[in-house]
Amino acid sequence: GRGSFTESFPLFGYDLHDYDSLFAEKLELLLAIRASERVSWSGSHRPSIEDRGVYPRPVQDPLPVWVAIGGTPKSAARAGILGLPLALAIIGGEPARFAPFAQLFRRSAADAGHGPLPFSINAHGFIADDSQQASDDAWPASQLLMNRIGRERGFAPVTREAYDAGHGLHGHTFTGSPQQVIDKILYNHEVFRHDRFLLQIIAGSMDHAKVMHAIELFGTKVAPVVRSEIAKRSATPVADPATSD
């Protein structure tokens, strides 16, 4: 993905105004390297490459390449046109508001002649034995992280009330008991019909044992139920809401 931080631009001597063209060109080069052991390539933001080998080669053939987005329609369309899987990060707001990105991605892929492509939802969250414990455990580390980044970008501090509001069924964080997280993943699947869900567990200054317990709950309590329920849905196809305007 293009990323939401800009520190690398002055570090590598790039102009921030070239933000989009840099990403498009770097992705084009990556795909060329993936497709061929020896590469000849030229672009606008780096010296040309003349018949150079790129090593070591990946074990997977082809190397999996996903396009990650947070809120840029052009990137969703680009992934579909190129026939690449899309990873949608939801870090704020109601997830259903992001359904148009899934629609655009799938429509762009179909228009470009590609079949169904993998699509993932990616979000922050934390799991504990009950919802209050999950929120209480995750809040200090979440507050520290969000407010530090917020200060750098001129955002108002995040309050506990706003943080807790994101834990509801229609909120953006997957924080709660195993059953709450199950319900939320399945609700999002109704909206997006995605193939993969990635949970970024809040860590940072959190107690390591609690993080390990959250991972255990995700693997033993949440994932099996979600897989079972989605298998039932797959056996009974319904209209995909993320492909309908």
Please describe what each predicted stretch is.
Residues 1-245:
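Active-site-adjacent structural elements that line small-molecule/cofactor binding pockets in enzymes
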